[in-house]
UniProtKB/Swiss-Prot annotation:
This is N-succinylarginine dihydrolase. NCBIfam families: arg_catab_astB, PRK13281.1. Substrate binds at residues 19-28, 110, 137-138, 212, 250, 359. Keywords: Arginine metabolism, Hydrolase. Homodimer. It comes from Salmonella dublin (strain CT_02021853). The active site is at E174, H248, C365 (nucleophile). It comes from the Bacteria. Catalyzes the hydrolysis of N(2)-succinylarginine into N(2)-succinylornithine, ammonia and CO(2). It catalyses: N(2)-succinyl-L-arginine + 2 H2O + 2 H(+) = N(2)-succinyl-L-ornithine + 2 NH4(+) + CO2. InterPro entries: AstB_sf, SuccinylArg_d-Hdrlase_AstB.
Amino acid sequence: MTAHEVNFDGLVGLTHHYAGLSFGNEASTRHRFQMSNPRLAVKQGLLKMKALADAGFPQAVIPPHERPFIPALRQLGFTGSDEQILDKVARQAPRWLSSVSSASPMWVANAATVCPSADALDGKVHLTVANLNNKFHRALEAPVTEALLRAIFRDESQFSVHSALPQVALLGDEGAANHNRLGGEYGSAGVQLFVYGREEENEIRPARYPARQSREASEAVARLNQVNPQQVIFAQQNPEVIDQGVFHNDVIAVSNRQVLFCHEAAFARQKVLINQLRTRVDGFMAIEVPAGEVSVSDAVATYLFNSQLLSRDDGSMLLVLPRECQDHVGVWRYLNKLVAEDNPISAMQVFDLRESMANGGGPACLRLRVVLTEEERRAVNPAVMMNDALFTALNAWADRYYRDRLTAADLADPLLLREGREALDVLTRLLDLGSVYPFQQTGAADG
């Protein structure tokens, strides 16, 4: 059956700021306390979406979350009206305020893991929400992510959205950032590659930075998504590259159809994995980048592998890259050599995503890949699909509500909370989502 890959990109939230919350993510740590520009950030993302949609790659949007997230502060023991809580936490525990104000939901590669209908035992599209329990600020996301996905993929005859795994370290799940699908045509059955950093009985794990994804979680997600067991491979990421800042597999590898583009040091037992894929995937091609041409540290600094690999109608592939790749002499030299060689990657497109990149999120972090047949695509909430009208409306919305500068100190401003809630109220109507945010369901206690 004919199917296409649709990229659902996350909209950057109104509280996008640099707080260094993500240990193991070196860009996040390096840019801590710098001033951010939320309006520029959301527009950089919108420009990427629109440019790819105009080039014929189907695009859709996933909204940001409610931030600052007052319910989490109430769970931590802060009391009073919303405004009183903001004041208390800013004075007593400002790091908590930064955590509950993180715009990290924009990196929707961590929102869920997706199984196309061609791979599922029941013939439906499955999405399992990620629990993201390695980081407090990200562990807050799962309930609202689930509500948003149910509002977008609302036809239960076509889609099954599964709640996140239990919030325990044993079942740490980071979503599609640790998942690849390889095969021929999108509508044909493929091989799903689940990548983990640790497993309970295995002493091979990183020493410096945490391995966020467990094998136990990957296996549970594969079961929930009803992936045909004959179409699954579980592989461990190289713990040495995790210790060099490769906190998700999509920082060191990206796949599309029959191509796996990765660093030569991406996986533990990489030769064994490549041979498995060669046996299981017709026409499989591994493009392994040697350390002599691009070091792991340069790959992390430029996010070379946090790129999007997209199929064009003629069968060739487009590599969507952050500007940092173009700015790095060695990486750019390698990329120009790559597209001149005999392989499906024949073109590159560079985007300025510096606001997201400074927090450790490149082009691939900002999108969730969902393979859909035409019938399934028609069943998606049409209001989230990117087109000229939505692009214009979202830019006007951003101009109205987003600030052009934000620091950690600004997060205590009660006006920012009110601006955010008003913006999300408007957005849910624009995208026909219903009342998906807690403040819409309970009413806001502004005091």
